[in-house]
């Protein structure tokens, strides 16, 4: 309901005159324009005059109240007093439209919010009392650890790392996490275990001249020897296959009246003829070349033994070989190791016997001496510069002090024959034993035992 508060001044005075004429003695208060702007009616007369409420909208007279009563001004939004039910309904609608809408609270709001339930078929567990983890992933605490559950008609299991249900094929037995997550987790956690057979602590590798618990495999190969003698201006080539992998790498020889034989590596027998009076056959150049070729790993420079005094045969000479020297061999004398084992290697040379330990566990290294020459008769033989010469006054063969780079030494001992030294350039091999010096055919039958040491 709207009020028209603006009235022209002429209409106000005309209305006051009409009321005054019809009132019969009492002049009602006139409504002025200023009072109309403030309220619906004003007090225009004295104390005895009546007040009127002017309805500006309808233009009719209001109800007259008692004397001294203050006029009541209608306020917008409030239903008029004394009006019908239509005015009251209109005021209530205006008040409802001006108030903001509010959301319902309390029990109604709790009923509208749905509580999550367990995703397992047939489970009616109330998750409102469970932890937030179980409410968020919609699984109860019991089914999160169950190895087999049915979800949407399929057999599944809850993965505690993925926080999801997976099929049973994605799990390992007795594992609560799926295989995909455990694969990367175990790879980061577990350290690789070293192979015990390939461990460096289990098998010591060979460093320099040290020994390993197992024999180092060496490849089988064939090498070509090049032999040149002083008498012949030509070189002779010999190719001998070496069966290194076999355990028959031993020197097995025998002494005969005709000469000294060296069957080496099962390649046949080679005779070194000395031209002795006991039926020895002189060794020709071809036999000497073949013998030196066979013994190429052992000798750097080998000279054929000269015939003794009074015996016919080939003269002394030198043979040069291009192979590496790992052992020294003197065919005029012999040394033997005491207490040699049964599987040791033996060489029978001219009445003496050399007993050598098996070489399959002793790696051969650098050459020991660069040259070796056989002398004849009672004269002194020319050896390498590292050892002094000693000549017996009685005309017997000279003995020598042999000094090698491996720290092997043998003092000067007078005997009837030159001594054979078999050594290895292994600086860290220690071996204590005795050398037996003297041949079987010595004149006095005495022998000397010499201590020696390999450092």
Swiss-Prot record:
Give the residues the record marks as binding Zn(2+) 1: 118, 123, 140, 143
- Name the UniProt key words of this record, in alphabetical order: DNA-binding, Metal-binding, Nucleus, Transcription, Transcription regulation, Zinc, Zinc-finger
Report the SUPFAM superfamilies cross-referenced here: SBT domain
Main location class = nucleus
Q: Which InterPro entries has this protein been placed in? A: SBP-like, SBP_dom, SBP_sf
Q: Where is this motif: Bipartite nuclear localization signal?
A: 175-191
- Tell me the domain comment: The SBP-type zinc finger is required for the binding to DNA.
Q: Name one Pfam family in it.
A: SBP
**What's any one GO cellular component for it?**
nucleus
Organism's domain of life? Eukaryota
What is the name of the protein in this document? Squamosa promoter-binding-like protein 16
Recorded GO molecular functions are:
DNA binding; zinc ion binding
Q: In which tissues is it expressed?
A: Expressed in young panicles.
- Tell me where the transmembrane regions lie: none
Where is this protein localized, as stated in its record? Nucleus
Q: Where are the zinc fingers (SBP-type)?
A: 115-192
Query: What upregulates it?
Result: Negatively regulated by microRNAs miR156b and miR156h.
Positions of region (Disordered): 182-204
Q: Which residues bind Zn(2+) 2?
A: 159, 162, 166, 178
Entries under PROSITE patterns matching the protein: ZF_SBP (PS51141)
What function does the entry list? Trans-acting factor that binds specifically to the consensus nucleotide sequence 5'-TNCGTACAA-3'. May be involved in panicle development.
């Amino acid at each position: 309901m709207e009020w028209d508060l603006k009235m022209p001044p002429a209409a106000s005075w005309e209305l006051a005159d009409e009321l005054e004429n019809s009132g019969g003695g009492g002049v009602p208060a006139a409504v002025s324009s200023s009072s109309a702007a403030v309220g619906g009616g004003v007090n225009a007369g004295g104390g005895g005059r009546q007040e009127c409420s002017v309805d500006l909208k309808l233009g009719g007279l209001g109800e007259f109240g008692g004397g001294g009563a203050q006029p009541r001004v209608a306020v917008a939004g409030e239903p008029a007093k004394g009006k019908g039910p239509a005015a009251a309904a209109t005021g209530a609608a205006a008040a409802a439209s001006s108030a903001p809408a509010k959301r319902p609270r309390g029990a109604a709001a709790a009923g509208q919010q749905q509580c999550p339930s367990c995703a397992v078929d047939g489970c009616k567990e109330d998750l409102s009392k469970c932890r937030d983890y179980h409410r968020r992933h919609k699984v109860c605490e019991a089914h999160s650890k169950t190895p087999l559950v049915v979800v949407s008609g399929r057999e599944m299991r809850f993965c505690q790392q993925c926080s999801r249900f997976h099929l049973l094929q994605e799990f390992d037995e007795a594992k609560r996490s799926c295989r995909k997550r455990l694969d990367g987790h175990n790879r980061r956690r577990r350290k690789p275990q070293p192979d015990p057979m390939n461990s460096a602590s289990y098998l010591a590798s060979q460093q320099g001249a040290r020994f390993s618990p197992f024999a180092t495999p060496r490849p089988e190969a064939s090498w070509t020897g090049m032999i040149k003698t002083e008498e012949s201006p030509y070189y002779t080539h010999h190719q001998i296959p070496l069966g290194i992998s076999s355990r028959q790498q031993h020197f097995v020889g025998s002494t005969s009246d005709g000469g000294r034989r060296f069957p080496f590596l099962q390649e046949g027998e080679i005779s070194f003829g000395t031209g002795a009076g006991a039926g020895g056959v002189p060794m020709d150049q071809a036999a000497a070349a073949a013998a030196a070729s066979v013994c190429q790993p052992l000798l750097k420079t080998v000279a054929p033994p000269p015939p003794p005094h009074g015996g016919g045969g080939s003269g002394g000479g030198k043979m040069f070989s291009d192979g590496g020297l790992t052992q020294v061999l003197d065919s005029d004398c012999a040394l033997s190791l005491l207490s040699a084992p049964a599987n040791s290697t033996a060489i029978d040379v001219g009445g003496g016997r050399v007993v050598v330990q098996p070489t399959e566990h002793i790696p051969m290294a650098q050459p020991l001496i660069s040259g070796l020459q056989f002398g004849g008769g009672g004269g002194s033989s020319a050896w390498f510069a590292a050892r002094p010469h000693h000549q017996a006054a009685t005309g017997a063969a000279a003995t020598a002090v042999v000094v090698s780079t491996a720290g092997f030494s043998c003092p000067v001992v007078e005997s009837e024959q030159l001594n054979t030294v078999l050594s290895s350039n292994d600086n860290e091999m220690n071996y204590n034993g005795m050398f037996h010096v003297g041949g079987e055919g010595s004149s006095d039958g005495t022998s000397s035992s010499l201590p020696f040491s390999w450092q």
